[in-house]
A protein has these predicted regions:
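N-terminal cap/lid segment of alpha/beta-hydrolase-fold proteins
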Residues: 1-24
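Proline/glycine-enriched tight loop/beta-turn segments at coil->beta junctions
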Residues: 13, 23-31, 57
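Active-site glycine-rich loops that stabilize anionic/oxyanionic intermediates
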Residues: 37-40
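Conserved alpha/beta-hydrolase
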Residues: 44-75
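Alpha/beta-hydrolase active-site loop
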Residues: 80-100
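Alpha/beta-hydrolase fold nucleophile elbow
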Residues: 102-114
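Glycine-rich nucleophile elbow surrounding the catalytic serine of serine-hydrolase chemistry
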Residues: 112-122
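Alpha/beta-hydrolase-fold enzymes
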Residues: 121-176
Length: 176
């Protein structure tokens, strides 16, 4: 079941986000946050979110400031004149705390593409203790290799089970 909610961004505009919750909940497997790329919006992920929802996951897809339903006072892709990265990190953390209040004792994972992947990478550096794993689709550099690999491995364990083994080359990196 999909429903839309909003919260007030640290940039003083409303951020719209969509929550997809399973129809029948015995126990939610995890909460998945989707951070999309710059020229996308939350509705692009309806099919994926519904698929994961049917598998027992709660999926949260937000349109950060300057995207999709959150465009009210901003042009597409425009975030404002201030320290944008800091504001986006605070907004992401606020949304996670909102969901943590609803789904306690539930693992949290992030999935990101393009700019969304870059945001998650920064979020992991600041708030990595608040979630269990991430899947980044796009350029990944600048995060400590050990922390990055652990978060990715945790995501694969969630999807494939505890006994799943990755190919040794799957997470090979040039990061130092």
């Amino acid at each position: 079941m999909k429903h839309e909610e909003t919260y007030t961004s640290t940039l003083h505009t409303h951020v719209h986000f969509f929550i997809y919750e399973p129809q029948v909940i015995i126990r939610v497997k995890a909460v998945l946050f989707v951070q999309h790329d710059l020229n996308e919006n939350a509705s692009n992920y309806d099919h994926f979110a519904n698929f994961m929802c049917d598998k027992g996951y709660v999926v949260v897809v937000s349109d950060m400031v300057g995207h999709g339903h959150s465009l009210i006072d901003f042009e597409q892709g425009y975030f404002g004149k201030t320290d944008v990265l800091d504001h986006l990190m605070k907004d992401m953390h606020h949304l996670q705390k909102v969901m943590m209040a609803r789904y306690t004792d539930t693992p949290y994972y992030y999935i990101g593409t393009g700019l969304g992947a870059q945001m998650i990478r920064e979020y992991a550096a600041r708030f990595g203790d608040y979630f269990q794993g991430m899947l980044l689709m796009g350029a990944v550099s600048g995060v400590r290799a050990y922390r990055y690999k652990n978060l990715c491995l945790n995501f694969f364990k969630l999807m494939k089970g505890e006994r799943y083994h990755l190919n040794k080359l799957a997470l090979r990196t040039r990061m130092k």
